[in-house]
Design a protein with these regions (language model features):
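Short hydrophobic/aromatic helix or loop-helix immediately within or flanking a transmembrane segment
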Residues: 4-31, 93
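Transmembrane alpha-helical segments of multipass membrane enzymes and assembly factors
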Residues: 30-31, 51-69, 108-111
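Transmembrane-helix motifs of polytopic, lipid-linked glycan transferases
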Residues: 38-63, 101
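Hydrophobic core segments of transmembrane alpha-helices in multi-pass, intramembrane catalytic enzymes
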Residues: 48, 76, 95-103, 132, ...
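Membrane-interface transmembrane helices that cradle and orient dolichyl/undecaprenyl
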Residues: 63, 102-130
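Short helix- or helix-capping micro-motifs
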Residues: 69-80, 137, 141
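Short acidic/glycine- and proline-prone juxtamembrane loop motifs at membrane-interface regions
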Residues: 84-94
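Membrane-lumen/periplasm interface segments of specific transmembrane helices
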Residues: 140, 148-210
Length: 210
């Protein structure tokens, strides 16, 4: 930036991870840009497989039919735009595995409805599931700020179910990665936490047509 640097409204966790990765590759003697990007593409490809595995598990839990779950995983793996976009440097795709993991743990924390219509106890402790779901949702927000609406929707659903404790646990878990990662990074760069998030909101309020 010319002149005095100022916040631009970008979450810095994802660029920061790339900075550390490129520094590591430089230290290992890999300084060719094309080879560096091959490494980046491979890491993104491996990370995108979380979507396939988690999508399979979500479909299996919702349908109780292995065939439906298998087809769901197959579509997630092969549907034309998924493999193409998953290896790109797109925060929309990089945050997707975190959202899928959050959805999975939310499902695990909600009692299942059996064939008799009675709710069975959740397979694992609800508190643990909600905490993990919140942490993964918070990590997704660290990558792409707009995913805050996913976390907001999940929190609202818990409130509508009158699960007050669960909503507090989930909300607290969402805030934890934001405070530790984005808050710390902004504090280090700008001397105040959450500067980039505030700038993002301010810019969009001032430029609603962009």
């Amino acid at each position: 930036q010319p002149g005095t640097p100022r916040p631009t409204g970008h979450m810095m966790v994802y660029p920061g991870v790339h900075y550390l990765l490129f520094s590591l590759l430089d230290a290992c003697g890999l300084d060719d840009p094309d080879r560096k990007m091959v490494v980046v593409r491979l890491l993104h490809a491996v990370w995108s497989l979380v979507i396939v595995r988690t999508g399979y598990r979500i479909a299996l839990r919702l349908s109780a039919d292995p065939r439906i779950a298998w087809r769901t995983g197959l579509f997630l793996a092969l549907f034309f735009f998924m493999p193409f976009l998953s290896v790109r440097n797109l925060v929309e795709m990089v945050s997707a595995p975190f959202l899928m993991l959050s959805a999975w743990w939310l499902l695990k924390g909600v009692p299942e409805v059996g064939s008799s219509g009675e709710q069975a106890a959740p397979p694992t402790a609800t508190a643990k599931c909600l905490l993990l779901a919140g942490i993964f949702a918070g990590l997704a927000i660290n990558i792409r700020f707009q995913t805050v609406f996913f976390a907001g929707g999940a929190g609202l659903a818990l409130l509508l179910r009158r699960e007050w404790k669960g909503a507090v646990l989930f909300g607290s878990a969402v805030l934890l990665p934001l405070i530790v990662l984005q808050g710390t990074i902004d504090l280090f760069i700008w001397g105040k936490p959450f500067v980039e998030m505030i700038e993002y909101v301010r810019y969009n309020l001032d430029n609603p047509d962009n």
